[in-house]
Structures are given as C-alpha cells and as structure tokens.
C-alpha cells in the first residue's frame, strides 16, 4: 500500500548498503497520513509549531566537543537570533570574531596576570562568535563554500596568533624563551590538520568516502549482519551501541577546537604560557596518535570492503 512506501524505500536503502541516519524531529511534526481525518488533525498540530525555534535548534550542532556543547552552544542561540534580526551575514560575524581574537592577542602579549585574564575573556568571546557564524549560516540558509573556507582559515590564524602572543608576553615578563614550545604547538596542530585533510581527500564522501555495506536480499532477516553472510548472526555495531560517556570521551581525546580554546582560556591565566603550551603539546600528541591510528584502521577496513 501507498502508506508503507516510505518504510519500503528505507528498507531497500538500508539493505542495499546505502548509509542512512535518523534525524531528530525536535519540535517539528512528522506523521504518516492514511486518511483525510488524520491529515486534518495533523494540519491543526502543525499550526502550533514554532518554525523559527525549530530552525534554530537544527542550526546548532549536537556532535561538538564537551566545552563547545556546554560553554557555547547552550546559549549561543540567543546571539544567532540577534545577529539574524540585525541582518548580519555569517562572514560579518567571522570578521567580528577575528577582531576579538586580535584584541585577545594584544592582551596576551602583555604577559601580566590582568593581560592574561582579559585576553582569555576576549579569546573565549571570539570562539563563541566563531560558532555563531556557522549557526547563523545554517539558521538563515545563507552558508557558502567561501564562508566555510574563510571560517576555517580564520580559525587557524586566530589560534596561531594566540600562541605567538602568549610566547611573546611570557618572554617579556619572565625573560624566558618559550618560542620552541609555541612553534611546536603550531606544528603539531598543522600536522593534525594535514592528516585529516589527506584522509578526506583519499576518501571523499561523494566518491565512496561514506562507508557502504554489501548489497543484501530483502528476504534476509533485518537483524542479520550482512558482513557475516547468511550463516552469521547480528552483532551490535556502530554508534548506536556506544555508551554516551564513551562518545564524549572520544570527542574530548581528539582535542577539538573547543577543548583547545578551553586550555588557552583556563590554563593561561592561572599557570601562564609555559604550562599552557606543555598541556597543548601533551594532549595534542595523544590526540594525533589516536587520530592517526583511527585513520589507519578505517583505511584498512575500507580497503578490505
């Protein structure tokens, strides 16, 4: 029957190995309509949906790191609304973020406790706006490839400027050279992004980068693992089986930009630049090894598949 067309289509996609994922509805409505009465009832329910709120919730990522999720995304939606009402473009927000990062670098270069505190506050606000520009682009549907590229370039530039300013400020106040640590942190970050970019080029999503399973007959039981063949049994696989704590731990161990921002904003004012760089190098080294191992394992799996 026509009412089951969606279910049959989804079944065919999944059993053909096409990657699909569930999208949370949030405050939106999505129901199967089988008759006129159900359609009229659903139309009445749709009238009460706050479309702006739904678009705002959809614009905020749910797969960010711990710091970004709780210290930024928990309240950045208010800034997105204000920016949209002020008719700011995502690129304009990116520019303001860069300006705040420049102010943070000036304060960091002072090397004093007050300078480090003020710099940390400005750098945090810069990161907040760095998240807001992408959220605004998704909320207003005005995102562009140029804006995404510009945002990425500015992210790296802001971090490198902060590292350089911290090193300069520490040398001015303490008379000690921590530039080797700062340069090491920059090189490690550049290496991590090179690894990620090389992997993305080797397995682009539009040319087989997304993991595809083998085609399978529609007559096979739904819980039979296609990788095990007809004699195999289903086995828990994928993110659906991972404990939430493990997911959060994996997001933190790779030291994403949110956690790097947290290290700069929290460690620098308390322990100053030297300890900040040591934390970034130690944590970044672990993250690089973890990421490299993961890329190798995934590459081997895809080569076998």
Model-derived features: where do they sit?
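Hydrophobic residues within alpha-helical transmembrane segments
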Residues: 99, 121, 125, 150-153, ...
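A feature for the membrane-embedded catalytic helix bundles of lipid/isoprenoid biosynthetic enzymes
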Residues: 4-5, 18-77, 154-305
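Basic amphipathic alpha-helical segments that dock to polyanions
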Residues: 8-17
